[in-house]
């Protein structure tokens, strides 16, 4: 089993870069959507809620397939070579699917953290004459720090979800596993892949715990 590890490690860079890029895009989107939900912006609130329902209510694999194969159903897109090339790129399609999926769950996580802030803190800011936007600027960082423990699960989940990218020909860890299995028909290839995922997930969890510990250091000092 361990003799397969060097070959499988060739796909680890793709898995990690896809994870990091997806998390960055998802964080930016989740921040925007969380602010919209908190400010209760008309129309936009319903659009965000519809988006969350769509991406949390359907399987990630279906989303990947629709984003990768869907544009092929619109022949007019082929009239724009640059756009067609981008939409035919497996890495970009996987990035879009993972980002949109993760952003939906992260928005729920962050919005839940904001709603968990004691009412007294909102009232204190209001008593100081602060607008809701100014209040958010103060309370949002606190809410995000409080949600780090749960967000670490999302980080691990995104990395594990990159294993689905092989279904659209992206050669990450699982892609190389399928390639090796096709050559050897040795099921232990997947055992070796499991070891890689287990080790990386353990390191990601440890990293998030350290970040959480540092971010919440002020609570221990108090």
From Swiss-Prot:
PROSITE patterns: ABC_TM1
Topological region Periplasmic: 1-15, 71-79, 176-186
Database matches in CDD domains: TM_PBP2
Membrane topology, Cytoplasmic segments: 37-49, 101-154, 208-222
A GO BP annotation: amino acid transport
Chief location bin: membrane
Domain ABC transmembrane type-1: 12-208
PANTHER family (alphabetical): ARGININE ABC TRANSPORTER PERMEASE PROTEIN ARTM, MEMBRANE COMPONENT OF AMINO ACID ABC TRANSPORTER
Name this polypeptide is given: Arginine ABC transporter permease protein ArtM
Source organism phylogeny: Bacteria, Pseudomonadati, Pseudomonadota, Gammaproteobacteria, Enterobacterales
Gene name of this polypeptide: artM
